[in-house]
Amino acid sequence: MDEGHVIVIGGGLAGISAALACSDAGRKVTLIEARSHLGGRVSSVKHPRQDWQLDNCQHACFRVYDRFLQLMGRANAQQSIKLQANTHLPFALPEKKVFSALTTGRLSPPNHMMGSMLSFPFLSMRDKLAMRKAVKALSSMDNQQMWQLDDTLFIDWLRQNGQTERAIDRFWAFFVLAALNISIQEASAAQACMLFKNGLFGAADAFDVGAFTSDLSDSIEPALSSALEQAGVKIIRNSTVKAVVIENNVFTSVKLKDEILQCSDVIFATPHHITARILENSVTKSEIPVLEEMGSKIDKLCTDIGRIEYRSLIGIHSFYRGNRVPKDFTFAVMVDQPLIQMVFNRNSELSSPIEEGVQWVTVPVSAADE
């Protein structure tokens, strides 16, 4: 065992953050990533016929993502994100040519969007008046009360708090789908309440939208790699962890294809099915008769992890000669559209176009399994 050595498995944002935190705490850290690049799902792929880097999906962030923005600051990558000066969330019903936006006004939270909400054409006055009860309940909720709702469906909580079906469909459901990547019929009330309490109805600038000014592989990966190296973190790319070794309830080593790394702690920052696979292959050793008990605990953990489900997120990229949407169009939520939930003009976000005369329009499809 290498005392004090932390091995982080997985080079996505969670793994990178964990590695930096451990290094800052004075620990020796090794980060292992199976692919050739860091960033996990926050990455890009090459267009099959053009020399363009395309993000695997349309990504955005919000000012309330303070830990993510802190990570970008740590990596000196702030310039890769363009944040709105004031919250502006456009909604559209194209077939009826109705467009409107929720914007920040002069009132203090949670009422800072009340002015634009009063003129919001997609909800009736009855819908809007009913929303006051839910907003009041969210504002008075503390964290303990929030997490006690984990086994409650958010749609049931909304109905219990007087929300109309139209408000659920045209307001609450969109934010749940976009932020949690799950339908409102399945979403935990605890998770959704946290989203609205800390986000939309939190600080006045919490939902200022942030867009990436270049492809993710260019804007994030080099900066994060540099930050890790400067912190003294050893990075191992293109290497898959096969198993971990546990002795007397302590992680002592990690097995790669051609080498074994000694350690005293392991952090899993991997998709849950990969975590389960590594643990299933783990080796347990003990000088006291708890080997069977330890193995049983790992088996149960793998079974529990295996119950966790995924929800897919698909990115649709369209390229046009000339403009299909106005040049000053940024993005909009598509009301009453189950598939085309949002439309983004990627040109409005980029620091320079991918090609002169080409307009890039993207559509993220959340909870695409459905």
What are these regions (language model features)?
Residues A14, H37, H273:
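Conserved Rossmann-like nucleotide-cofactor binding loop
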Residues S23-P48:
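Glycine-rich FAD pyrophosphate-binding loop
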Residues F68-L69, G73-R74, Q78-A189:
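Mobile amphipathic helical/loop "lid" adjacent to a hydrophobic cofactor/ligand pocket
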